[in-house]
């Protein structure tokens, strides 16, 4: 019994000693806090909250840094990294590439280039393969509409929307010009040189020009084998894909300006291509006579200005011209030669 009592007394003494130490420490800190203290300067740096992250429908976004890491040539190649997207490739290296979201068809998909809708009044399709990533700063995908007050009727009526934001010139201190040239090669005879030039006209106005050339033969080896109902090989053919070539040029020019409470942009675009349409792989058919020529050009302008915290204006204007020439010179089919 005495041993248990002594142990309890020891614990009690230790607690009293600890209370004394805490009391002394508190008095010391109270004395310091009762006087004026000097705090070192703290600088907090952060990025503004991007409006799309406050959207009702979240957006999938590919930034410029992400696009540079991707092994992609065009906007169509980059969009396949988004979830829930069905990329339709109509064959060949230069084949038409469109996007389908929510299984509602390509015609219900809206594509916007710097906030202005892209379209083709002839066929209603937007070929995303003709837009290079060299001039793109950001690609956003919405499974619906974005939560922005400035939207056209096409925004609200589309099942999905893609927003392509082009790159605005940025200059280091003391520099007035930027130049970049690239050369890409790949399979099937692909050659893709491109260049971009930016010039600072003044502190508020800058210009940009870019161009590229794409050429590919589209020839690749394939094997076509078929068995009959008994499981025996009916025929086994190895051949080269024909009529899958492309020869295309793209040029863009932009004029960018900044104001006290806004900014404006004028952009001109032209795309010219000649391509073959390889068609389906059919037994003993190795040559297709379908050819397609496209010329797509537009000039557009955007002006935004914030007059106050509650009042903001946006003006968009655009003129576009599209030309399509289609030929089918296959000897076994009805020959066609149409121009739109």
Explain the meaning of each model-derived region.
Residues 40, 97, 158-160, 177-179, ...:
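Hydrophobic, lipid-facing positions within transmembrane beta-strands of outer-membrane proteins
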Residues 76-120:
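Extracytoplasmic beta-strand/coil segments of soluble accessory domains associated
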Residues 133-180:
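A beta-strand signature from Gram-negative outer-membrane beta-barrel systems
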């Amino acid at each position: 019994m005495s041993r248990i009592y002594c142990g309890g007394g020891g614990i009690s003494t230790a607690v009293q000693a600890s209370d004394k130490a805490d009391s002394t420490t508190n008095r010391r800190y109270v004395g310091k806090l009762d006087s004026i203290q000097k705090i070192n300067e703290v600088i907090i740096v952060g990025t503004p909250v991007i409006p799309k992250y406050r959207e009702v429908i979240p957006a999938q976004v590919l930034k410029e840094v992400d696009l540079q890491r991707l092994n992609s040539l065009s906007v169509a190649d980059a969009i396949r990294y988004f979830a829930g997207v069905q990329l339709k490739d109509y064959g060949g290296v230069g084949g038409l590439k469109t996007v389908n979201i929510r299984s509602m068809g390509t015609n219900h998909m809206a594509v916007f280039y710097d906030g202005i809708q892209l379209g083709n009044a002839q066929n209603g399709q937007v070929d995303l393969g003709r837009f290079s990533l060299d001039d793109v700063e950001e690609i956003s995908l919405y499974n619906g509409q974005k939560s922005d007050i400035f939207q056209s009727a096409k925004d609200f009526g589309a099942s999905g929307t893609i927003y392509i934001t082009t790159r605005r010139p940025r200059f280091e201190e003391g520099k007035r010009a930027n130049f970049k040239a690239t050369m890409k090669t790949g399979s099937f005879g692909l050659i893709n040189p491109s260049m971009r030039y930016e010039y600072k006209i003044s502190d508020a106005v800058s210009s940009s020009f870019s161009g590229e050339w794409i050429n590919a033969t589209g020839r690749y080896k394939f094997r076509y084998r078929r068995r009959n109902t008994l499981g025996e090989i009916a025929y086994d053919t190895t051949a080269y894909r024909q009529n899958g070539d492309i020869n295309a040029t793209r040029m863009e020019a932009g004029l960018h300006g900044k104001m006290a409470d806004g900014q404006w942009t004028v952009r001109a675009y032209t795309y010219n291509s000649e391509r073959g349409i390889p068609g389906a792989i059919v037994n003993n058919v190795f040559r297709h006579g379908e050819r397609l020529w496209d010329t797509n050009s537009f000039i557009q302008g955007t002006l935004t200005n914030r007059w106050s915290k509650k009042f903001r204006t946006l003006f968009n204007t655009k003129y576009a011209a599209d030309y399509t020439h289609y030929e089918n010179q296959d000897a076994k089919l009805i020959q066609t030669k149409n121009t739109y």
